[in-house]
């Protein structure tokens, strides 16, 4: 992940922190998952965004692992709605089929790049998830407003 997709993720993380200042998580994933801000961590949003902006995409994508990590984070949430927002093209290249993990989540929203959304749209349809596309970071507020 780099460039515009990284900017999209940074804006999304900042928006989530603003919307639910005490009850949010940010996970980055490839073949493993990294909690940039776990559910019970009180990190400043700016530190989370800075860490996100330092990431560089690499390797394979374990979507199942990412969704299971999200479920573990949300187990600690006090929110009435436990929403997973997945920013991804949804091409799982490692791990097992992520559909079962996706269907176990309370509420899943898939937000995909509008120029690379076909696999994500199909994944969302099969998982029973809501779906949106974004053309850039400026589209994130409207996409998140629809979600939250």
What are these regions (language model features)?
Residues 17-20, 74, 127, 131, ...:
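Conserved NTP-handling cores and scaffolds of large molecular machines
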